[in-house]
Amino acid sequence: MDSDFGIPRELSPLQQLRSQYKPELPPCLQGTTVRVELGDGTTVAEAADSHTMARAFPHTLGQPLAHFLRETAQVPDAHIITELPSVRVGIVFCGRQAPGGHNVIWGLFEALKVHNAKSTLLGFLGGSEGLFAQKTLEITDDILQTYKNQGGYDLLGRTKDQIKTTEQVNAALKACTDLKLDGLVIIGGVISNTDAAHLAEFFAAAKCSTKVVGVPVTTNGDLKNQFVEANVGFDTICKVNSQLISNACTDALSAEKYYYFIRLMGRKHSHVALECTLQSHPNMVILGEEVAASKLTIFDIAKQICDAVQARAVEDKNHGVILIPEGLIVSIPEVYALLKEIHGLLRQGVSADKISTQLSPWSSALFEFLPPFIKKQLLLHPESDDSAQLSQIETEKLLAYLVETEMNKRLKEGTYKGKKFNAICHFFGYQARGSLPSKFDCDYAYVLGHICYHILAAGLNGYMATVTNLKSPVNKWKCGATPITAMMTVKHWSQDASYTLTSIGRPAIHPAMVDLKGKAYDLLRQNAQKFLMEDLYRNPGPLQYDGPGADAKAVSLCVEDQDYMGRIKKLQEYLDQVRTIVKPGCSQDVLKAALSVMASVTDVLTTISSNGGQ
């Protein structure tokens, strides 16, 4: 019911305490002046996509990075915006809820009112459907009171549908025009921010004055690139999951007779599973990216687990905890091929009960082998973005079933001499994504909300609010905005076996995989054998808001060497210094030295670029 949105919440004592917490702002966002420096124009993420991207985004491709600066910054090219008229801004939750989302609204609202008290913030009720239907709620400080630093998306509600069809895009344009919006802020993950980029281009082509801004909010942690270090919600969901996992570890160690198979929400890629492993130290984690890279079959994975169970039994350890990302199932080559066939037949209108008779021989053989509960789940209709309904596919139960079958066989044959194998299965996701947000997510979301205002005040369209150097304290965060087109790529795939016919996908932000050459994965690999055999279980405990642990951040964030925006800014400063020193009239020695150094730098950068930046 629309009337339920925005009503005051009943708050527990802890929630009341959290609602009084005021997140800190970095120095560049403090005060009442907007100072923005626009850098060089951005390039496409993949050179091969240049032509397709140029055709898709003639108005918004190649826009510059924006850096927001503190009021006292001595930057001659910075644009200082002092005239800040009242504006009307719409904001909408798209995609699944993530802890901290409400603080984006709070941060934007505060920035609007600080710079001009007459500005208006309208929340669209029920996500994108509310946008199309122009169902709005005017955000006020009274309405926000019981939603500050709180979880969920229940202030406005949400949808997970895309803004993609011609009808939907036109409805969004009409809503923004009818409501006289100066800006539209879209909160979501890779799909929602892809839609934001296309919407910004459509608005620009239609000469609509509404500027579109995206905000990286998703528990999956897969909206990652050089510009985006973390997503709002990821920190919280990993900390909550890690406590639950650690509790299971303690239980397993106490009873010494159960293996816990725990599947973690996180869509196709394994960022949540990797981070939770680094925080809680379970015995095993099966990352989808490892499986895909090694082309492991479902039977290979089951054998890996069985061998681990047998090795632990030799050490008189008949218990353990195994983490499984929900996207593992689509990383297994033969299962992925089966799902593609099933989805193709469903799109053709074939009923679920007749699909098994129309599968190819290989897929049919696999399908018939699978237990009935998995068959039923694989036959579910795909999501709106054509992906499988991963949260509904109980991969943990499938693996537990296969492992139990094999261990019983080994027990009978005498090759396994441990206790009878007992599995307990769990799926963690819904329990965590509605949690109170962590201190980090509260701060990060609030800052992103403020940045959204600065983007709109600077008149920028098709940008994402970004913060880098996140592993440092808030006062060292670098705030800016990146054209969403700079994060987008185009998928190409073959339509036939000869590879002569290829299809080109819609330009999109594609989910980032776990980097198997990254420092977070390397940390896992260094410790994997110890985690497997030594029961080094670690319990981080519940979310902390004060004292030890309150300022802890994701391990995968802290081990990486990032701050791309800060380094781009530093490079720009060096180049400016070079231009100041080396100009007509400088000495021959200065000119020769500059040429020599620049030639060497160019050679090194050309070599690195040709190797794909590795």
From Swiss-Prot:
Role, per record: Regulatory subunit of pyrophosphate--fructose 6-phosphate 1-phosphotransferase.
Regulation acting on activity, per entry: Allosterically activated by fructose 2,6-bisphosphate.
Predominant location category: cytoplasm
Subunit text: Tetramer of two alpha (regulatory) and two beta (catalytic) chains.
Protein name: Pyrophosphate--fructose 6-phosphate 1-phosphotransferase subunit alpha 1
Transmembrane portions of the chain: none
Coiled-coil segments on the chain, per record: none
Cellular component aspect of the GO annotation: cytoplasm; nucleus
One Pfam family linked to the record: PFK
Protein family (similarity comment): Belongs to the phosphofructokinase type A (PFKA) family. PPi-dependent PFK group II subfamily. Clade 'Long' sub-subfamily.
Pathway noted in the entry: Carbohydrate degradation; glycolysis; D-glyceraldehyde 3-phosphate and glycerone phosphate from D-glucose: step 3/4
Gene: PFP-ALPHA1
UniProt KW Magnesium keyword: yes
Species in which this protein is naturally found: Arabidopsis thaliana (Mouse-ear cress)
Gene3D superfamilies in the cross-refs: 3.40.50.450, Phosphofructokinase domain, Phosphofructokinase, domain 3
GO molecular function, a single term: ATP binding
SS bonds (residue pairs): none
Subcellular location: Cytoplasm
Loss of function: phenotype: Retarded growth and reduced pyrophosphate--fructose 6-phosphate 1-phosphotransferase (PFP) activity.
Keywords tagged on the record: Allosteric enzyme, Cytoplasm, Glycolysis, Kinase, Magnesium, Metal-binding, Transferase
InterPro entries linked: PfpB_PPi_PFK (IPR011183), Phosphofructokinase_dom (IPR000023), PKF_sf (IPR035966)
Summary of the tissues where the protein is detected: Expressed in leaves, roots, and flowers (e.g. sepals, petals, stamen and gynoecium).
Entry's induction text: By sucrose, glucose, and fructose.
Lineage: superkingdom: Eukaryota
HAMAP family in the cross-refs: Phosphofructokinase_II_Long
Gene Ontology terms describing biological process: photosynthesis; response to fructose; response to glucose; response to sucrose
